[in-house]
Amino acid sequence: MALDIFDKNDFKEKVTKKSFRKEDIFKDGYFTITDIKQAVKNPNRANIFVNGKYRFSLDIFQLTQLNVKIGAKFSEDEIFNLEQQSEFGKLYALGLNYCLIRPHSEKEVRDYLWKKTLNRKLRNKKTGEFYEKKGVSIVSAEQALQRLIEKGYVDDFKFTKFWVENRNQRKGSSIKKLKSELFSKGVSSEIIEQILSESSRNDGEEIQKIIAKKAKKYTDEKKLVAYLARQGFSYDEIKRAILKEEF
């Protein structure tokens, strides 16, 4: 899900050229921003050229915050920091899009961003040769996660409430299974218990939903009992539900 944040006129205003001489590009050991071009594949970002060559990309908010303009000069350490900001910006955008698909737990988002830190073996479409793409820094991944938490896009309370309210709502799901799923996603037992205590879902109603869906498939009572047990329902709950169906 792309976020269309660029306005062409605004972009031009942010990167308005300043007059500078070519001989000043390397003056005093500083690096000069020689050009800024709106990215083609991702128009929400701008490609930054340093000393005549592409170096990194930033989003429009970063251009303003970091005061990156054509003709601006930066030290080697400052350029390195800008590259780290570039990496952070890309990761934050990826994490944000991931969170907007559906709510995710903190562990899910951390695992998603962690994968970006791993080196990947890719294939060049033109030459067919394989090459290794270096992963992003762990620091940038953690910074992106913390920003998502600060902005409220990652919240285990909200995620757990979403999961309990929507997970197999029509098909039915045992409370035990819901707990197991949430625990596997890194949600603490305290949060799970609190949200479930506030929920109207209960095993009595959930098992009836499942029986209504599966009764035709499992005509043999023993097989139905075994299936319900695998779904996390207790033996007593299963027997009560089946007796209720019989009457």
Feature roles, as predicted:
Residues 1-247:
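An alpha-helical, amphipathic repeat domain used for nucleic-acid recognition
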